[in-house]
Amino acid sequence: MQLSSLTAVSPVDGRYAGKTSSLRPIFSEYGLIRFRVMVEVRWLQRLAAHAGIPEVAPFSAEANALLDSLASDFQLEHAERIKEIERTTNHDVKAVEYLLKEQAAKLPELAAVSEFIHFACTSEDINNLSHALMLREGRDSVLLPLMRQIAEAIRELAVKLADVPMLSRTHGQPASPTTLGKELANVVYRLERQIKQVAGIELLGKINGAVGNYNAHLSAYPEVDWEANARQFIEGDLGLTFNPYTTQIEPHDYIAELFDAIARFNTILIDFDRDVWGYISLGYFKQKTVAGEIGSSTMPHKVNPIDFENSEGNLGIANALFQHLASKLPISRWQRDLTDSTVLRNLGVGIAHSIIAYEASLKGIGKLELNAQRIAEDLDACWEVLAEPVQTVMRRYGVENPYEKLKELTRGKGISAEALQTFIEELAIPAEAKVELKKLTPAGYVGNAAAQAKRI
């Protein structure tokens, strides 16, 4: 059976293939091979640029052009050739080396130094840098733009609905009023904190040999400052952060940090998805219908909040994967074991489920329509929420047991506007204070919620 969106085992490459296509050049097998080739090529160029390695003279413009084309314009046919070589070698990184030697043979200048391809490297030197480059491209070109798009979409909604008063609910019960925009602004602030942390995670790399001590490097060129050269390569050539202390593997702590930060963003988005789902259920939001869509196979009237439900489900899967990778990858027996290898092949899966979720949330946000009448009805039915300001003013003027008196009047039961007005009139407080309290309505008792929403 041929692989297609219908036959793929994972919905990431099946049902949701169209939503995850931007990740294929980055996190696929092709993507990993592409980055391995880039690292190998740049390492060879780094050796040629080093005055302490005379056996690899500085490359000509022609040689650098050939190498640059391999690194920056890597073709699918090259990856297919590497997989063909791997069927013989049964070693994926060695197959990359052999492909590069084949390409180097096209130019005598490069053919003469082909044994310096993969010089002094262990496979993990190439792999760890490739993984860091994959994560950087996936984060910067796909993940962060979508994260920012979500925060901006919610921000626009928050500002638009800044002045819409709404009944709060704590423990599911009526509480002091807020505005719908302010509750959305809370989400924006939380999301943007995590976006900043995701963007700020340093992506680490190493190229220090089989156990992290430059053993092979120093045996061949003891006079070269290999640590300085490695730092220049990783930070100057690749734009990553140099990790000076490793075993055979870069310990992956930064991957745990990155995935934990993405998972926190996802957790906040789950909270948002559930809250909006609840507001739709209460009737505070209506959803724009799409011609031809069906909400239920048996109930024709249904317009379900499926986008927020899809988002919540995919975010849960993503976070489960991130949690496993973040807890497993920093652990490796002694100088290394191979348990990280198969796990690292799943770097893009949690990110894929995340972007599926982000697209679903954005689609859901785009369908939302305010039902102002329904929100106002709920608020006007809960005059008991004004017990808080009344008892607070009573405290100011020294009325005994203000909390207890309001508790007796309101706890567990609704009260009318008239009943509250009568209670206020009988209070032993200044007349002007009574006037101000009588002006209060649930819709007007929102503090500075609107101002907070507008400045987000």
Curated annotation (Swiss-Prot):
Question: What are the record's GO terms for cellular component?
Answer: cytosol
Q: Which reaction does it catalyse?
A: N(6)-(1,2-dicarboxyethyl)-AMP = fumarate + AMP; (2S)-2-[5-amino-1-(5-phospho-beta-D-ribosyl)imidazole-4-carboxamido]succinate = 5-amino-1-(5-phospho-beta-D-ribosyl)imidazole-4-carboxamide + fumarate
Fetch the Pfam families from UniProt.
Answer: ASL_C, Lyase_1
Q: What class of enzyme is it?
A: lyase
Q: Which InterPro entries match?
A: Fumarase/histidase_N, Fumarate_lyase_CS, Fumarate_lyase_fam, Fumarate_lyase_N, L-Aspartase-like, Pur_lyase, PurB_bact, PurB_C
GO MF term list: (S)-2-(5-amino-1-(5-phospho-D-ribosyl)imidazole-4-carboxamido) succinate lyase (fumarate-forming) activity; N6-(1,2-dicarboxyethyl)AMP AMP-lyase (fumarate-forming) activity
What residues does N(6)-(1,2-dicarboxyethyl)-AMP bind to? 15-16, 90-92, 122-123, 248, 297, 302-304, 310, 336, 341-345
Q: In which pathway does it act?
A: Purine metabolism; AMP biosynthesis via de novo pathway; AMP from IMP: step 2/2; Purine metabolism; IMP biosynthesis via de novo pathway; 5-amino-1-(5-phospho-D-ribosyl)imidazole-4-carboxamide from 5-amino-1-(5-phospho-D-ribosyl)imidazole-4-carboxylate: step 2/2
The biological process GO terms on file are: 'de novo' AMP biosynthetic process; 'de novo' IMP biosynthetic process
The active site consists of 171 (proton donor/acceptor), 296 (proton donor/acceptor)
The record, for PROSITE patterns, names: FUMARATE_LYASES (PS00163)
The protein's UniProt keywords, in alphabetical order, are: Lyase, Purine biosynthesis
**According to the UniProt entry, what is the EC number of this protein?**
4.3.2.2
The family database entries (SUPFAM superfamilies) matched by this protein are listed as:
L-aspartase-like
Query: Subunit composition?
Result: Homotetramer. Residues from neighboring subunits contribute catalytic and substrate-binding residues to each active site.
Family membership = Belongs to the lyase 1 family. Adenylosuccinate lyase subfamily.
Q: What does this protein do?
A: Catalyzes two reactions in de novo purine nucleotide biosynthesis. Catalyzes the breakdown of 5-aminoimidazole- (N-succinylocarboxamide) ribotide (SAICAR or 2-[5-amino-1-(5-phospho-beta-D-ribosyl)imidazole-4-carboxamido]succinate) to 5-aminoimidazole-4-carboxamide ribotide (AICAR or 5-amino-1-(5-phospho-beta-D-ribosyl)imidazole-4-carboxamide) and fumarate, and of adenylosuccinate (ADS or N(6)-(1,2-dicarboxyethyl)-AMP) to adenosine monophosphate (AMP) and fumarate.
Q: Which PANTHER family match?
A: ADENYLOSUCCINATE LYASE
Protein name in UniProt: Adenylosuccinate lyase
Q: Which organism is it from?
A: Pseudomonas aeruginosa (strain ATCC 15692 / DSM 22644 / CIP 104116 / JCM 14847 / LMG 12228 / 1C / PRS 101 / PAO1)
Gene of origin? purB
